[in-house]
A protein has these predicted regions:
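Short amphipathic alpha-helical interaction segments
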Residues: 158-173
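C-terminal scaffold of the Radical SAM
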Residues: 1-158
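Minor-groove-contacting beta-hairpin "wing" of winged helix-turn-helix DNA-binding domains
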Residues: 183-187
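Short, amphipathic alpha-helical interaction segments positioned at domain boundaries
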Residues: 189-197
């Protein structure tokens, strides 16, 4: 009833992913990747699927689509979900945990990960506790990714947020977003660039 249609991520620097044999010349260009996505999107829409957020599609009766309509759609590290997840525990090497107020990443090699687990240690290598500004930015990013719009509270602003607003002016000129006061809406034309917004 739902599927994720992700673009290939070329990460040859990550050990063990088997991508070292490819180089940039073996891969489709950004324009070719976009065409592939648009062709796939068209085929999925012909089968009755509706685009939900970025890279996700669902049938109309699926609760993922219903949560989009009801403005309850949420996104976490795994993709879009119909329920707000405030705790995700990452299991395995390099996995990322998210407690809403903090992120933690596990050690990146199998050997070190296994050793720490066998010794009863938590295999976290790094983390970040979100401050109030981080949480504000996170909320706006989620609003844009899930609802294609967000409204900034002028009483809860800070310089970086105002700078982001200025950077969006070029996207507004390209008709990718509409800005009305402190409200940003991603246009249909801009939907393909949601990650960039």
């Amino acid at each position: 009833d739902r599927l994720a249609f992700y673009s290939y991520a070329h990460v040859p620097w990550v050990k063990g992913v088997g991508q070292r044999g490819f180089d940039e010349n073996d891969l489709p260009s950004g324009e070719e990747k976009r065409r592939l996505y648009e062709d796939g999107k068209k085929l999925l829409e012909e089968l009755g699927y509706i685009e939900v957020g970025m890279d996700h599609f669902s049938l109309e009766h699926d609760d993922l689509y219903q949560s989009l309509i009801q403005k309850k759609l949420h996104r976490n590290f795994m993709g879009y979900t119909s329920s707000k997840t405030q705790l995700m525990v990452g299991l395995g090497m390099s996995a990322i945990s998210d407690s809403w107020y903090a992120f933690a990443q596990n050690i990146k090699t199998v050997e070190e990960y296994q050793k720490m687990v066998e010794e009863g240690e938590i295999p976290v290598v790094k983390g970040h506790i979100l401050n109030d500004e981080d949480l504000t930015v996170r909320r706006h990013i989620l609003n844009l990714m899930c609802q294609l719009e967000t409204t900034f509270d002028i009483h809860n602003s800070f310089p970086e947020l105002e700078n982001a607003f200025e950077m969006l002016k070029e996207m507004e000129n390209d008709e990718l977003v509409e800005i009305n006061g402190h409200h940003i809406h991603i246009t249909e034309k801009g939907r393909a660039f949601t990650r960039n917004v």
